[in-house]
A protein has these predicted regions:
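A detector for small-residue-rich transmembrane helices and their helix-helix packing motifs
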Residues: 1-133
Length: 133
């Protein structure tokens, strides 16, 4: 993607994620004037781009009592599902624990959309290549 394209991608995901948070707060009756500042929406977009670019790349995660390696599409996909579940649960109350779930969801969705515009050629890493042996 390159440095400049990555910066623009990151900032666009962040701005669009913040707009998702503001609009969802207004739509669902929460106070839209509560300030929200953070990079989590932009990072959500980066996670989506990583999942699209390297779906089978192994990610190290802590599960129960040990570290294991799972494919990126599974780890990031489950993270996104948890954001949707927690975001839906936060709609029922006045507080979401200070977490802007709509920004996470919006940043992820916009990351999925924007990565197609910003990446011209997908680089296949050696560990992602299939072997006949």
């Amino acid at each position: 993607m390159g440095h400049l394209k990555y910066l623009i991608f990151y900032l666009l995901c962040g701005v669009l994620a913040s707009l998702c948070h503001v609009f969802s707060s207004a739509y669902f009756g929460h106070n839209p004037y509560i300030p929200s500042l953070g990079a989590s929406g932009a990072i959500s977009g980066v996670l989506a781009a990583y999942m699209i670019q390297h779906p089978t790349r192994k990610v190290h995660v802590w599960i129960l009592f040990g570290i294991t390696s799972l494919p990126a599409f599974l780890v990031v996909g489950l993270w996104f599902v948890f954001q949707i579940i927690n975001g839906y649960g936060a709609l029922g109350g006045n507080q979401a624990g200070g977490v802007a779930y709509a920004a996470h969801i919006g940043g992820f969705i916009f990351g999925l959309i924007l990565v197609k515009m910003f990446v011209t050629k997908r680089v296949v890493l050696p560990e992602e290549r299939k072997s006949f042996w």
